[in-house]
Amino acid sequence: MAKTIAYDEEARRGLERGLNSLADAVKVTLGPKGRNVVLEKKWGAPTITNDGVSIAKEIELEDPYEKIGAELVKEVAKKTDDVAGDGTTTATVLAQALVKEGLRNVAAGANPLGLKRGIEKAVDKVTETLLKDAKEVETKEQIAATAAISAGDQSIGDLIAEAMDKVGNEGVITVEESNTFGLQLELTEGMRFDKGYISGYFVTDAERQEAVLEEPYILLVSSKVSTVKDLLPLLEKVIQAGKSLLIIAEDVEGEALSTLVVNKIRGTFKSVAVKAPGFGDRRKAMLQDMAILTGAQVISEEVGLTLENTDLSLLGKARKVVMTKDETTIVEGAGDTDAIAGRVAQIRTEIENSDSDYDREKLQERLAKLAGGVAVIKAGAATEVELKERKHRIEDAVRNAKAAVEEGIVAGGGVTLLQAAPALDKLKLTGDEATGANIVKVALEAPLKQIAFNSGMEPGVVAEKVRNLSVGHGLNAATGEYEDLLKAGVADPVKVTRSALQNAASIAGLFLTTEAVVADKPEKTAAPASDPTGGMGGMDF
């Protein structure tokens, strides 16, 4: 495909037009009085959202240079969302302000590389100030306030705070769609995975269609179990001990399954067979997690253990195991606490080293099952469009709350960034680097000004007033009052604010140092074929 090339000012201005098109659509959503954006979908109902990254993802521009500019800003929003779960609109507004000021200085003759270095040094200084001023999140109320700001709904904030209180900071909070109105919170104690009993004959509670085993032995096998002769010696030992048995294996089939079912029906021996969750290496890892949680060993020929030689010392234990046809919950496994802590640390290291979002999510789920618990927030709404929008807001708010616990909180509403600007005066920079730091100083006002504008107030007047207030005091845009924002519950996780600024500065540096853009040449659409009816189509003969 042929390419089209633009150089220096033309290239940078093309990129800036794309950035502005995207940023102007996103920034209307900033703040408590921000508006929504409607996104058309090829299939199904349109989506209504105020989430920056969702809006950014949908924007595709026609002009090749503008398209590249928009794609670069999408990267800012996506990266901020990946790291912190929120702050995508703030990041976009900051990027737009940095690029606008930066390009003005480049056009006036400043050296782009000098500006870039100045911007980087200034951002490092502001980040240092933010982390220093951050307040630790200690109470349930602080978590609720932070989550409520992200979701724009106090009831959602309260529910997330309760969920985090129950499952702990390491626990997983998932959001599901509900067929009813309102919000519900479901808590799962112990480890739950999405595989249930293999046969309905294992059910012990016919009304609830559940199989419940009290204080069972737990056998974990990495392969299929099909022949009964391998299993018999172990079954005899379990029967002698007067216990029930849970078998979790790749599969239980044939005569082995028949024997278990027949003994269950006759009342001779209580057991349940369940397929192991996951596939391949992930299945092995999850079996190992269960082994550590219950104090078992995984029976696998890879480590020289066979089913016929298995004795009770290789089995795990738990206070209770509950199975439905779709899922299994192991409550209070009898594993060694030090071994569990070691496994948790190992999974945490894997999360840090993982490049894949999918792998990271799966590892996070495994971590929660071992370290904390699982809370499910069920969200309902009147229409499908509203339901999707609400579910998305709750997911963002959950990640926002976790970010707050991780690094602490600072005053929200764009105030902290503006009030961090004086720290840049301590930087002893000269020439273009000093200009770069000044660009950051101007850009730090942009989020507050945009929040004020969206609230129907005069941005310049608000910024000047907040600049002269004591640290942490500023405009509460929801009420129009100037007050102590942390006391009023207007807080942002420092991780969100920091990530937004760092990612915006990163992309602004790329914009300023761009000297040429190579893009695909738009293909000319083929001229329509001539009308075979000679222009007289539609005549009725």
Swiss-Prot record:
- Superkingdom assignment: Bacteria
Report the InterPro entries cross-referenced here: Chaperonin_Cpn60_CS (IPR018370), Cpn60/GroEL (IPR001844), Cpn60/GroEL/TCP-1 (IPR002423), GroEL-like_apical_dom_sf (IPR027409), GROEL-like_equatorial_sf (IPR027413), TCP-1-like_intermed_sf (IPR027410)
Question: Any one cellular component term from GO for this entry?
Answer: cell surface
Subcellular location(s) of the protein? Secreted, Capsule; Cell surface; Secreted, Cell wall
Q: Which PROSITE patterns does this entry report, sorted A to Z? A: CHAPERONINS_CPN60
Q: What is its EC number?
A: 5.6.1.7
Miscellaneous comment text of the record: Purified 65 kDa antigen can elicit a strong delayed-type hypersensitivity reaction in experimental animals infected with Mycobacterium tuberculosis. This protein is one of the major immunoreactive proteins of the Mycobacteria. This antigen contains epitopes that are common to various species of Mycobacteria.
- Report the protein name in the record: Chaperonin GroEL 2
Q: What class of enzyme is it?
A: isomerase
TM ranges are: none
Q: What reaction gets catalysed by this protein?
A: ATP + H2O + a folded polypeptide = ADP + phosphate + an unfolded polypeptide
PANTHER family (alphabetical): 60 KDA HEAT SHOCK PROTEIN, MITOCHONDRIAL (PTHR45633)
Please list the disulfide bridges. none
Q: Which residues are ATP-binding?
A: 29-32, 86-90, 413, 476-478, 492
Organism of provenance: Mycobacterium leprae (strain TN)
